Amino acid sequence: INNKNIGYAKYVADNQIDKLGMHKSYNVLEHSKFINNLIEIKSIFLFFQNKEANIFDELILKMTSVLNEYFHKDGSIPLFNGSNNIYTKEIFNSLNKENFLKKRIFSNVDNGIAFYSDKNKKVFFDVVQPNKDMISSNLSAGTLSLELSGFGEKIFTNCGASENFGKNPEYLRYSAAHSTIILQNTNISEIKEANPHIRFPQSVVFRRESNEREEIFEGSHNGYLKKFNKIIKRKLIIDTDFDK
């Protein structure tokens, strides 16, 4: 293990993880696999008694704390970007919750999956800004889609993917089978199989407000501006009363 290898590992981590600590595929399974890869790298460093063995400790903790938030009240994960619940039990069991001395407070999300949680409710909101980078090659056409669970039951969901390989996950990526908003049965994102988006909203904007009674998520995108002269906006008003 030399400085070049360590530098490359840092480069990969910096380019694949967003500032909140989420893998830029915005797929919980891929996120979990990346955490496991970092843990394996640390184990290799420790085996060779490398002084850089703890270099990814902060990132592992950051990513694990985000993963800890990605569960609905029924124990399932949100089905964004081809996720599925085949490995949910393994993902949940991999979390060592004893590492968290206090609950992490997440700063405002400006790009990614925004979420709200209380004792009985969980809300996820897709405000990911698609791009042409290869890291986006698994993103679905689900801008402004949402998931909601409450009192142990999933209420709104996305299509996800029934398996990890084959044509079905790819088909579902570019279908409109997401809880998003469309005009005249047209999709805002053009996706080619096994590639990043060809056409996508150039601007996805997210705003979050809080008051004593409500948490407000508001997202918008310009994917229909050129063809329909419309800005699409979705506003979620969440009652913060735990019993509602």
Regions found by a protein language model. Name each.
Residues 1-27:
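Active-site lining segments of carbohydrate-active enzymes
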Residues 11, 95-101, 191-194:
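Short, charged, low-hydrophobicity "junction" segments
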Residues 16, 22, 76-79, 170, ...:
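Residue-level preference for alpha-helix termini and adjacent loops
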Residues 18-159, 211:
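Carbohydrate-active enzyme catalytic cores, enriched for enzymes
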Residues 104-244:
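Non-catalytic C-terminal accessory modules of carbohydrate-active enzymes
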